[in-house]
From Swiss-Prot:
This is Acetylglutamate kinase. The record marks 32, 254 as: Transition state stabilizer. GO terms for cellular component: cytoplasm. It comes from Saccharophagus degradans (strain 2-40 / ATCC 43961 / DSM 17024). Transmembrane segments: none annotated. GO terms for biological process: arginine biosynthetic process via ornithine; L-arginine biosynthetic process. The lineage of its organism: Bacteria, Pseudomonadati, Pseudomonadota, Gammaproteobacteria, Cellvibrionales. GO terms for molecular function: acetylglutamate kinase activity; ATP binding. HAMAP family: ArgB. Pfam families: AA_kinase (PF00696). Signal peptide: none annotated.
Length: 300
């Protein structure tokens, strides 16, 4: 049984959340689910409960998920070798079959099942369903120091988003379902393409003109050169941090995706620590949050 102090603490939390619930009711929140949160049972369950609660208080959560480690595990079991170019998995036809099995099958349905078990109504789709994600082949240009020129590297069925068919998402949301999207696109020729989940989440947020884009990561947020988390940034400041080398390496594509989304009309982007239970709720419903908030200069 709760003590009075414990009950008061619960009331305090709910009171702090109230203005945020009022502010974001009816708004679309795109959440990219990835990293440790996808492989830890406690984090999986807390994420699912967060999404269900968002829906229950009137928000429209859209989930986009990754699955790189799970793809790697199955490729290893099948003795299919993997290689990477600039952080992207080279995806031949055999690898693409595995990507579709893992992203469109195992991982997508696990997330849908988790949300549904926690009281939500989720439906899983890939970008091939209803031509949700129209993709084009991604080309990689790499400079060759030997000849002082660029060479085009073929990395197979790796794509980028050409267009998003928002009507598919609208049908699900208007029917009170929570869409769970696997980042597999379809090309003009019907071929499947493996697309970075952060990029898909960003493009979905842009097309829907979402209130928020939230990217779960394995770090506490964007850090400065001394290791301190930068809790609030404008798009202009992010550009400066990219230019001076503060943002680099694996964080650069994620930040660029968030930056592009905000510049294209998404109200705010959040780089949040997916290792923290209930990170999504903490970022939306508390004053302190658990990551880095990026907003446009004119709306900061």
């Amino acid at each position: 049984m709760q003590t009075q102090d414990q009950a008061l603490e619960v009331a305090k939390v709910l009171t702090e959340a109230l203005p945020y619930i009022q502010r974001f009711t009816g708004k679309t929140i795109v959440v990219k689910f990835g990293g440790n949160a996808m492989t830890d049972t406690e984090l999986q369950n807390s994420f699912a409960r967060d999404i269900v609660l968002m829906k229950l208080v009137g928000m429209n959560p859209i989930v986009v998920h990754g699955g790189g480690p799970q793809i790697g595990d199955l490729l290893k079991k099948l003795n299919i070798e993997s290689s990477f170019v600039d952080g992207m998995r080279v995806t031949d036809s055999a690898t693409m079959d595995v990507v579709e099995m893992v992203l469109g099958g195992t991982v997508n349905k696990q997330i849908v099942s988790l949300i549904n078990r926690n009281g939500g109504q989720a439906i899983g789709v890939t970008g091939k369903d209803g031509n949700l994600i129209h993709a084009k082949k991604l080309t990689v240009n790499r400079k060759s120091p030997e000849v002082q020129a660029s060479e085009i590297i073929d990395i197979g069925h790796v794509g980028e988003v050409k267009t998003i068919n928002r009507s598919v998402i609208d049908v699900l949301v208007n029917s009170d379902f929570i869409p769970v999207i696997a980042p597999i696109g379809v090309g003009d020729d019907g071929a499947s393409y493996n697309i970075n989940a952060d990029l898909v989440a960003g493009k979905v947020a842009e097309v829907l003109q979402a209130e928020k884009l939230m990217l779960l990561t394995n770090v506490a947020g964007l850090q400065d050169k001394s290791g301190q988390v930068l809790t609030g940034l404008t798009t202009g400041r992010v550009d400066e941090l990219i230019a001076d080398g503060t943002i680099y390496g694996g964080m650069l594509p994620k930040i660029s995706c968030a930056l592009d989304a905000v510049k294209c009309g998404v109200k705010s982007a959040h780089i949040i620590d997916g290792r923290v239970p209930h990170a999504v709720l903490l970022e939306i419903f508390t004053d302190s949050g658990v990551g880095t908030l990026i907003t446009n200069e004119y709306s900061a």
